[in-house]
Amino acid sequence: MSDKWSPNSWRNKNALHMPNYQNEDHLNKTLNEISKYPPLVFAGEARLLKKKLGEVSNGNAFLLQGGDCAESFADFHPDNIRDTFKVILQMAVVLTFGASCPIVKVGRIAGQFAKPRSSATEVINDLELESYKGDIINGIDFNQKDRDPNPDRLIQAYNQSASTLNLLRAFSQGGFANLNKIHQWNLNFVKGENAAKFREISSRIDECLSFMEACGINGNSVRQLNETDFFTSHEALLLQYEEALTRIDSTSGKWYDVSAHMLWVGDRTRQLDGAHIEFLRGIENPIGIK
């Protein structure tokens, strides 16, 4: 592995599970356009997450990461974003109480559009087409037009990620993440017949919140009870897209992939001499290995 790294040095390595774009000029024009777009996240946010993950590794905090296997363009709706965020918050409250430590909340959201496949192509009724590899690459319908990798999908993925992040920031900082509100959601949940085993812990949390309220500790007096830090993550699979969103941080002078706070390499692409490891070794984001 060469010591010299750049955002495109991965191109000198073997890149598995990458789509075959028919129109390279169209692809390059699209990537050049994306490279001029604003960052989806900020380097300082990625540094904050790395610091918090250090606390996790030292046993002083707990990591909660969740979200869809793959996001889709068709299911893009504010209600779906809200519900994913809401479930993660509900889980975090219970974990915070049970573990008596901070919970680092990371969503598999706002960028999880690509899917590695065991086979590059799919055959139905003697027709062989490219396998569906996620909405950022191609469509799920089995026809030539949908299955051909389309560079325009990269821009749609960027725009959907930007909209999702905008809503997540509003939810996390605008009062939706208020601790009492989250606890009320949990109280409503435990009323169900299948949730009886959670009622005891919900009752104990309720007592703690009532005590805090009596002491004047609430969302109005303590910021941490009214908002929360929330980070995004996805698999760094489509390296052309990740390269286009890799920038030098003006504060530190280091490279960050500003498509997400945290990136990970999948089980199928973590070869030490492969393109994905080559790309990820040069960025300062927190990195996961599946």
Language model segments and positions:
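N-terminal ordered "arm"
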Residues: 36, 56-85
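N-terminal basic/disordered segments at the start of proteins
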Residues: 2-62
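A generic short-segment signal for beta-strand/edge and adjacent turn/coil regions
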Residues: 28-35, 70-75, 255-260
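Active-site-facing alpha/beta catalytic cores
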Residues: 76-86, 90-290
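Dynamic "connector" segments at or just before major functional cores
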Residues: 39-45, 54-55, 59-61, 69, ...
